[in-house]
C-alpha cells in the first residue's frame, strides 16, 4: 500500500486540547484521516473521525492499546518542573510503544528552537535538546520500515499559553527586535509543516526543522550602503 495515495491513515497525537496539537489534529481531519488524541484536558474537537483519551501522558499504566498507528506526533509539552518527564521521557515511552512497529509511516517530535540556542529555562532546554538526539535514534530504527522521524522545532507561536507574552507590550517589542520576520507563527502554520513532514515527505529523516521567523539566526549583517 502506498500511504501517500490514501487518506485513511491512523494518526496519534499527544496534547490536542489546544494550540499546536489541536491545529495539527484539525489539519489531518480536514484531509480525512483517523485521528486519536491524548491530553489531560478535554477536547474541543467534534468530528466523527476523532477519538479523544483524557489522561496524562506520564500515566503509562493506563495508556490505551492502539494498534497499527501510521503517524505518531509527540506534541504534548510543558514548561515547569515536569519538563524532563513530559517533554522527553513521555516522548520516549510513547514512541517505543506506538512508533516502533512495521505499520509506522512517520514519527514527528514537536521540539523547540530553544534546543538550538539554549535561550530558555535550563530544564526546558535540556528536555528539548535531548529530543534532538532521540529523534536521530528513532530515525535510524524506523528506516527499516520505510518510515521517517524528524523534529519540528518552532520558535514563538501564537497559542493561548503564550497570551501572557503577546500581551506584554515591552516584552513583545523586545522579542520582535530579535525576530527578522517581525512576527510569530500561527498554530495552523506549524500544522502545515507537521502535515508535510509526516505525509508528503518520504526522504528527509533524522533532521530538526527550525521554524522561528529567523530568531535563532541572531543575524548581524553589515554591508556598505
What residue ranges belong to the model's regions?
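Catalytic loop of short-chain dehydrogenase/reductase
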Residues: 106-130, 135-144, 156-157
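Short, flexible catalytic-loop segment of classical short-chain dehydrogenase/reductase
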Residues: 153-164
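Short, small/polar-rich loop/turn modules that mediate ligand/substrate recognition or access, typified
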Residues: 143, 148, 205-207
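C-terminal substrate-recognition "lid" of short-chain dehydrogenase/reductases
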Residues: 183-211, 216
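Conserved NAD(P)H cofactor-binding loop of Rossmann-fold oxidoreductase domains
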Residues: 75-79, 214
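N-terminal Rossmann NAD(P)H-binding glycine-rich loop of SDR-like oxidoreductase domains
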Residues: 17, 25
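Hydrophobic alpha-helix immediately C-terminal to the catalytic Tyr-X-X-X-Lys motif of short-chain
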Residues: 28, 94, 130, 134-142, ...
